[in-house]
């Protein structure tokens, strides 16, 4: 079985690829090594993957259809796991075009490639951000999600709709996964866990939005990967061509509790500055995992404090702090 993972130099893509390589599967990674965040971190991830004989890496942008066709023609994948995207909520306010290019045009290319090469299962990353300002807690796949709070969320909802259309028209088995806030080793420097940890270690003041009245469904990256692997061999049935599922811990954590856990793990106190809610931000996220659990079984969620300690230990070792 040949598997292509786009975004393989990214946080989740790298972690998934490494786990599948440990299972001796043939993995082909595609990533453009975007400078959105530290390219050296991405290259370090790729160098880890290239230690496996069954891994092959392609540096390519998913918006470059000609190059993507060459890669797919060479591999002819059985399964396509699409994790490449322009991430970030706040950055979408500064550089909207990059979201249109990567998340809409790039995803359109992914759908076309899935059609042309008759992939047996397309799995793609959506996001909990599609729930926008939804007041119903926990977030369910049955909730109304047509009022996104930012462009990033709008592109992810668009991906779900585009996938549904292609799946219906061309019988492409596809599964969208709404990831909730992911943390853990090899994490993204632009995300809150890394930003907060770096601020604590450097004794810098942390700007805490909405005066600390936030909660997030923080989900350990290995738990996300467990979910992805369960989905991998279980494409939607013939009469249910395209499906969307939440993947989270199902346990909301207050932001202040998250900061306290990081403080405890490093033995240092954070300097805090409380500010208001920022444009496009969600106050609370919390996954209803019922649909996923019914379809694939319950994920054994990593203990929050254990996950935080594992993340901190990796950070201190990787950055030689």
Where in the sequence are the language-model features?
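N-terminal Rossmann-like NAD(P)+-binding domain of SDR-like oxidoreductases, especially those catalyzing
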Residues: 1-182, 314, 318-321
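Generic recognition of short, well-ordered alpha-helical segments
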Residues: 15, 40-41, 70, 91-94, ...
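C-terminal substrate-binding subdomain of Rossmann-fold SDR/epimerase-dehydratase oxidoreductases
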Residues: 19, 200-321
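Short, conserved catalytic or interaction motifs in soluble domains
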Residues: 38, 185, 249
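Short alpha-helical
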Residues: 63, 87, 187, 253-254, ...
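Short beta-loop-alpha junction of Rossmann-like oxidoreductase domains
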Residues: 133-135, 185-187, 191, 291
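Hydrophobic alpha-helix immediately C-terminal to the catalytic Tyr-X-X-X-Lys motif of short-chain
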Residues: 158, 162, 166, 196, ...
């Amino acid at each position: 079985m040949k598997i292509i993972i786009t975004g393989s130099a990214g946080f989740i893509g790298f972690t998934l690829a490494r786990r599948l390589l440990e299972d001796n599967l043939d993995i082909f990674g595609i990533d453009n090594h975007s400078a959105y965040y530290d390219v050296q971190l991405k290259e370090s991830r790729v160098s880890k993957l290239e230690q496996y004989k069954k891994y092959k890496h392609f540096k390519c942008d998913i918006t470059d259809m000609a190059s993507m066709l060459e890669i797919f023609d060479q591999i002819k994948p059985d399964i396509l796991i699409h994790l490449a995207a322009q991430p970030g909520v706040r950055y979408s306010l500064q550089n909207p075009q990059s979201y249109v290019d990567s998340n809409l045009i790039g995803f359109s290319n992914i759908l076309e490639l899935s059609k042309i090469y008759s992939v047996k299962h397309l799995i793609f990353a959506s996001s909990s951000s599609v729930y926008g300002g939804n007041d119903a807690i926990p977030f369910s796949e049955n909730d109304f999600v047509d009022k996104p709070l930012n462009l990033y969320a709008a592109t992810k909802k668009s991906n779900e709709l585009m996938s549904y259309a292609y799946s219906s028209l061309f019988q492409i088995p596809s599964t969208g996964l709404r990831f909730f806030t992911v943390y853990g080793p090899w994490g993204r420097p632009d995300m809150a866990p890394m930003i907060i940890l770096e601020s604590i270690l450097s004794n810098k003041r942390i700007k805490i939005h909405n005066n600390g009245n936030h909660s997030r469904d923080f989900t350990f990256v290995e738990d996300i990967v467990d979910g992805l692997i369960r989905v991998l061999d279980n494409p939607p049935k013939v009469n249910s061509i395209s499906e969307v599922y939440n993947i989270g811990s199902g346990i909301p954590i207050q932001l202040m509790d998250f900061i306290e856990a990081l403080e405890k793990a490093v033995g240092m106190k954070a300097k805090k500055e409380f500010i208001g809610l920022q444009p496009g931000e969600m106050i609370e996220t919390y996954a209803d995992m019922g649909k996923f659990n019914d379809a694939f079984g319950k994920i054994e969620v990593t203990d929050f404090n254990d996950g935080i300690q594992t993340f901190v230990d990796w950070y201190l070792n990787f950055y030689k702090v």
